[in-house]
Design a protein with these regions (language model features):
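Canonical P-loop GTPase G-domain recognition
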Residues: 153-155, 162-221, 225
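Residue-level signature of catalytic and energy-coupling elements of molecular machines
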Residues: 50, 54, 60, 83, ...
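Catalytic P-loop NTPase motifs of RecA-like helicase/translocase cores
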Residues: 79, 102-104, 136-137, 164-165, ...
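Conserved G1/Walker A P-loop phosphate-binding module
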Residues: 2-115, 119-121
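P-loop NTP-binding site
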Residues: 225-333
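Conserved glycine(s) of the Walker
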Residues: 56, 196, 287
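Active-site phosphate-binding and catalytic loops of NTP-dependent enzymes
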Residues: 70-72, 139, 212-216, 239-250
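Conserved C-terminal guanine-recognition region of P-loop GTPase G domains, centered on the G4
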Residues: 91, 115-184, 257-259
Length: 333
């Protein structure tokens, strides 16, 4: 027991030393959770999260919101829509938006995804630009140049610092990014480990403009329940399949019948080719059954109800490049 206690004390000392190092690099001062709420008048604002694919934007969003509103996988382009997560206290409301990673589009769906990221630059009160400790700062220079010209507060989040071996490595990374975004405040953190995220949250609260809330105080998101069902199913496809199949998939909920204790859901998975349909279903339907089981369990956790899930697969040729289908699937207004 003595060794366990000593280990915990040692870990806490290391954590505090790391926080002191970050404070010295960035000028931030740690803020206890119960001291971070703003005072009257009420504050509210839109905080948009942008950056390249696979830097941890969705992980950060979920950590800031305190709920799993964005799906997370190791694959790039997991986020296709602009997803809202809302944080409420008596003193403030923060409307976070997670956006697709910035990319050079190869088809119309990706053009729509890029549009969400670009649009996030136009309607934010505060902008979070997320990168990580391995990303090349010159990637997508045109988008970064637009971020650098923003007149609103820009917070540069350097994620995944738990992967670094020395503080010197962090100093070099911060210095490189400050050359590109000289006016941004820098927040090195690990969203996965929840390290330094409270300091980021505290600064966001400080920067919020005075405003009444934009949504009801019990709101978590502006997305309907069906949206989260489709995202959970798509997440299971992304984690169970490789190559082009997960990127060729769209999910539509055809039926969502909710009673007091259960939900009956019927959803269609669209792919672009017959060969993809065969791969998705698997031998004897084994793969589709696996996806359905995994999705059903997560949907039950999300809604805290028993779920009956039926999945069907249909072919919709080249839907990612067809404007009418992108409108039908909610990517284009």
């Amino acid at each position: 027991m003595i060794e366990d206690k000593d280990t915990k004390i040692s870990d806490e000392i290391e954590r505090r030393e790391a926080e002191d190092t970050i404070a010295a690099l960035t000028g931030q001062v740690a803020c206890p959770a119960d001291k971070c709420e703003s005072k009257n008048p009420h504050k509210a604002g839109f905080v948009n999260i942008v950056g390249n694919p696979n830097v941890g934007k969705s992980t950060l969003m979920n950590d800031l919101v305190g709920e799993r509103v964005s799906i997370i996988t190791s694959k790039a382009q997991t986020t296709r829509h602009r997803i809202t997560g809302i944080v409420n206290t008596p003193d403030f409301q923060i409307v976070f938006s997670d956006t697709p990673g910035v990319l050079k589009p190869n088809y119309k769906l990706q053009e729509s995804m890029l549009g969400y990221a670009q649009g996030a630059l136009t309607d934010a009160d505060i902008l979070l630009y997320v990168t990580d400790v391995v990303e090349d700062p010159t990637k997508n220079a045109d988008f970064l140049a637009r971020v650098a010209k923003e007149k609103i507060p820009v917070l540069l989040v350097i994620n995944k610092i738990d992967l670094l071996k020395t503080n010197g490595d962090l100093e070099a990374i911060v210095a490189r990014w400050k050359q590109i975004l000289p006016n941004a405040e820098v927040f090195p953190l690990s969203a996965k480990e929840h390290f330094n995220v409270p300091n980021l949250m505290a600064r966001i609260v400080e920067l919020l403009p005075p405003s009444p809330p934009y949504f009801g105080k019990d709101a978590l998101t502006d997305k309907p329940a069906r949206f989260f069902v489709t995202e959970i199913i798509r997440e299971k496809i992304l984690t169970n399949y490789d190559k082009e199949v997960p990127y060729s998939v769209e999910v539509i909920v055809e039926k969502f019948d909710e009673s007091e204790n259960s939900i009956h859901i019927m959803a269609t998975i669209f792919v672009e080719r017959d060969s993809q349909k065969g791969i998705l279903i698997g031998k004897g339907g084994s793969m589709l059954k696996k996806v359905g089981t995994e999705a059903r369990k997560d949907i039950e956790l999300f809604f805290d109800k028993r779920v009956y899930l039926e999945l069907y697969v249909k072919v919709e040729p080249n839907w990612r490049n067809r404007e009418n289908k992108l409108k039908a699937f909610g990517y284009i207004e």
